Amino acid sequence: MRKMLAAVSRVLSGASQKPASRVLVASRNFANDATFEIKKCDLHRLEEGPPVTTVLTREDGLKYYRMMQTVRRMELKADQLYKQKIIRGFCHLCDGQEACCVGLEAGINPTDHLITAYRAHGFTFTRGLSVREILAELTGRKGGCAKGKGGSMHMYAKNFYGGNGIVGAQVPLGAGIALACKYNGKDEVCLTLYGDGAANQGQIFGAYNMAALWKLPCIFICENNRYGMGTSVERAAASTDYYKRGDFIPGLRVDGMDILCVREATRFAAAYCRSGKGPILMELQTYRYHGHSMSDPGVSYRTREEIQEVRSKSDPIMLLKDRMVNSNLASVEELKEIDVEVRKEIEDAAQFATADPEPPLEELGYHIYSSDPPFEVRGANQWIKFKSVS
């Protein structure tokens, strides 16, 4: 009897040392998965599109929630560091658009490729880099993903080609990456992203044409967040049906605020490209909470009420949270624990990003050539290694 009481005492003692929420989560039986109805995609030159129901596992749901919260908190921390003048220069935040970067990544393979414009922090994270590397890049430190030389608009990772500062210029590059996939006989696709503000660029239509001619495995993706800088899509485009703008290229319009819609549409598009049918176009209808950049307050061309309405009715993180809680895939307490862990991760990364040293001046000329540069050509001078004065 004494042994039994001692065993019970040890169990209770161990439980008392853990947070109450963790004890409750550990003792609760959650569903392994749940089926959800999702919004039907609008189609162009397609007889059928992505499914209108999808299964979400508890494991995937928790992973997506953590990733979206991480992107959200990372962007809010970047906002804070910018206002403290620790981050300088251009800075474009993607809070509100988390379902796009996380949902797209959930629909492809790590060996697939992705290229985007300058609102790239979220994609840099979902492609596999850490918050520490991203924030350190924003602050221009040696530990940044581009050694502190790229900043907000020029981040890179394996199979992630930026972060490009010229509006629309990444789209022909994405078609070129898809050409390389086909030329090398690899079962890979390239996600080529651009915004509604870039959608009227002539180079994009040229990329459409070549991709269709050569049947390239390229998924053209227009992130339609309703505004190109401060200009609404209705004032900028004669046709706002961006998923139809490829004309001869099939397209689909997707609810970009719903991660499950984005995931299923991406899986559909990737399968289409892998089958050898050529390119496809996706329009993700999304919304950014911040202004175009940090110099844009974001309320001169739209109202605060409009922003708040989207936050209250269509927030991608809240939508996933409600689904998971209501279907017994997770508890409110468990998701709150994730929130706490994410906040700590962001704070730790921010401390590193402010304490890490800046790259010395002599590294200014590094990482330009893949091998020893041909300085003897045309009498070019050797790079002079200046000593850093910082």
Swiss-Prot record:
Co-factor requirement: thiamine diphosphate; Mg(2+)
Check the UniProt entry and state the signal peptide residues, or none: none
GO biological process, any: pyruvate decarboxylation to acetyl-CoA
Residues annotated with Phosphoserine modification: 232, 293, 295, 300
Q: How is its activity regulated?
A: Pyruvate dehydrogenase activity is inhibited by phosphorylation of PDHA1; it is reactivated by dephosphorylation.
- Point out residues bearing the modification N6-succinyllysine: 63, 244, 277, 313, 385
Chief location: mitochondrion
Record carries keyword Cytoplasm = no
Matching entries from Pfam families are given as:
E1_dh
Q: Which domain of life is it from?
A: Eukaryota
Q: What is its EC number?
A: 1.2.4.1
- The top EC class, named as a word, is oxidoreductase
Q: Name one GO cellular component term.
A: pyruvate dehydrogenase complex
Q: Where does thiamine diphosphate bind?
A: 118-119, 165, 167, 196-198, 225, 292
InterPro entries, alphabetically? DH_E1, PDH_E1_Alpha_Subunit, Pyrv_DH_E1_asu_subgrp-y, THDP-binding
Entry's transmembrane regions: none
Annotated binding of Mg(2+), by residue: 196, 225, 227
Q: Keyword set for this entry?
A: Acetylation, Carbohydrate metabolism, Glucose metabolism, Magnesium, Metal-binding, Mitochondrion, Oxidoreductase, Phosphoprotein, Pyruvate, Thiamine pyrophosphate, Transit peptide, Tricarboxylic acid cycle
Q: Where does pyruvate bind?
A: 92, 118-119, 157, 165, 167, 196-198, 225, 227
Q: Modified after translation how?
A: Phosphorylation at Ser-232, Ser-293 and Ser-300 by PDK family kinases inactivates the enzyme; for this phosphorylation at a single site is sufficient. Phosphorylation at Ser-293 interferes with access to active site, and thereby inactivates the enzyme. Dephosphorylation at all three sites, i.e. at Ser-232, Ser-293 and Ser-300, is required for reactivation.
- The organelle transit peptide extends over 1-29
How it assembles, according to the record, is:
Heterotetramer of two PDHA1 and two PDHB subunits. The heterotetramer interacts with DLAT, and is part of the multimeric pyruvate dehydrogenase complex that contains multiple copies of pyruvate dehydrogenase (E1), dihydrolipoamide acetyltransferase (DLAT, E2) and lipoamide dehydrogenase (DLD, E3). These subunits are bound to an inner core composed of about 48 DLAT and 12 PDHX molecules.
Function text: The pyruvate dehydrogenase complex catalyzes the overall conversion of pyruvate to acetyl-CoA and CO(2), and thereby links the glycolytic pathway to the tricarboxylic cycle.
- Could you tell me which PANTHER family the record lists for this protein? PYRUVATE DEHYDROGENASE E1 COMPONENT SUBUNIT ALPHA, SOMATIC FORM, MITOCHONDRIAL, PYRUVATE DEHYDROGENASE E1 COMPONENT, ALPHA SUBUNIT BACTERIAL AND ORGANELLAR
Stated name of the protein? Pyruvate dehydrogenase E1 component subunit alpha, somatic form, mitochondrial
Q: Which gene encodes it?
A: PDHA1
